């Protein structure tokens, strides 16, 4: 049974494969993996920057992802090489794996969005070749970060930080999916002046905030500041999120695709999806509605899994 701590004075993960405060950290499996992450993200943004192939929102997102992941990975390597984990302002038990999970999801999204919405519309030539190569290195980075998550996640019977457990990793996934939902509903006309759809947007926002607060509490090692026991907080949060998303999974598709509510059940009925209207790197309204419906279902499954796994955790204080 997985074991986690609500508060700890230990600053390094017990499952770390690196030698803390030594150059040998770079020769251990986890250190070599982080070097691969560092190199692949650096090469990805360097290739794109050298030809300026990152204009527009999709290109900007990809460039931000690679630069951000490179910078934070470099900070983690410096911390471990210098043995500065005790001085790090965040919980070292929780920070590396939390970042690795976010980085894997960020790089995955860039590896999909960048080539499908940007690269394929570039003319053949040096810029396109560099963009394709950058996408390849983005995929490598995604695999490297996912491998780190697999290596450092909690094992049955192991004492570790909450973010290394399945519910902790699910919190990262839930917040990431919510951010994608927010991107798709950035067009207010999709839900304004329709109370049922506005309720769905409120659900996405409330659940995102609660999950993000959980992540921040663990990163700051502040779970003891809650007015209620942390396990109770987690169980209540997961149950509330499941109930809220259960309403959204019914209301959003119903009011977006049912003709009884003046919606378009087929893509061809939405004028914003006509070829003459949609720009190459834009998503039409019907596709946005469908994407949000799918992502709502995915996040509901994540919250259900979160609720189930949370009941299997044993919390101890050391």
Swiss-Prot record:
Pfam annotation, one family: MARVEL
Membrane topology reported for the UniProt record: Multi-pass membrane protein
Subcellular localization(s) per the UniProt record: Membrane
Parts of the chain that traverse the membrane: 35-55, 58-78, 95-115, 131-151, 165-185, 197-217, 233-253, 290-310
Domain MARVEL: 25-157, 162-315
Primary localization: membrane
Record's keyword terms, sorted: Membrane, Repeat, Transmembrane, Transmembrane helix
Single GO cellular component term: membrane raft
GO biological process: establishment of endothelial barrier; intracellular signal transduction; membrane raft organization; negative regulation of actin filament polymerization; negative regulation of gene expression; negative regulation of heterotypic cell-cell adhesion; positive regulation of cell migration; positive regulation of substrate adhesion-dependent cell spreading
Keyword match Repeat: yes
Membership in a protein family: Belongs to the MAL family.
The protein's name: Myeloid-associated differentiation marker
Gene: Myadm
């Amino acid at each position: 049974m997985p074991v986690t701590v609500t508060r700890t004075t230990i600053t390094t993960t017990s499952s770390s494969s690196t030698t803390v405060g030594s150059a040998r950290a770079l020769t251990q499996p986890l250190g070599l993996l982080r070097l691969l992450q560092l190199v692949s993200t650096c090469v990805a943004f360097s290739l794109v920057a050298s030809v300026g192939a990152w204009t527009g929102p999709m290109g900007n997102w990809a460039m931000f992802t690679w630069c951000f992941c490179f910078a934070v990975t470099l900070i983690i390597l410096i911390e471990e090489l210098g043995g500065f984990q005790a001085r790090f302002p965040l919980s070292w038990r929780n920070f590396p794996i939390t970042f690795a999970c976010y980085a894997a999801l960020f790089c995955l999204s860039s590896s999909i969005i960048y080539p499908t919405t940007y690269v394929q519309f570039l003319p053949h030539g040096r810029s396109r070749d560099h963009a394709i190569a950058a996408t390849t290195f983005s995929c490598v980075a995604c695999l490297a970060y996912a491998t780190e998550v697999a290596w450092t996640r909690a094992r049955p019977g192991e004492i570790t930080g909450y973010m290394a457990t399945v519910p902790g990793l699910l919190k990262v996934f839930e917040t990431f999916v919510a951010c994608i939902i927010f991107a798709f509903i950035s067009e207010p006309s999709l839900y304004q002046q329709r109370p049922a759809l506005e309720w769905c947007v409120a659900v996405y926002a409330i659940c995102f905030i609660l999950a993000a607060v959980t992540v921040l509490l663990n990163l700051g090692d502040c779970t003891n500041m809650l007015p209620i026991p942390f396990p109770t907080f987690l169980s209540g949060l997961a149950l509330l999120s499941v109930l809220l998303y259960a309403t959204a999974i019914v209301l959003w598709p119903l009011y977006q695709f049912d003709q009884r509510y003046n919606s378009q059940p087929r893509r061809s009925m939405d004028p914003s999806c006509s070829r003459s209207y949609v720009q190459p790197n834009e998503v039409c309204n019907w596709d946005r509605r469908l994407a949000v419906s799918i992502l709502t279902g995915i996040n509901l499954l994540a919250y259900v899994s979160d609720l189930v796994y949370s009941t299997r955790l044993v919390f101890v204080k050391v």
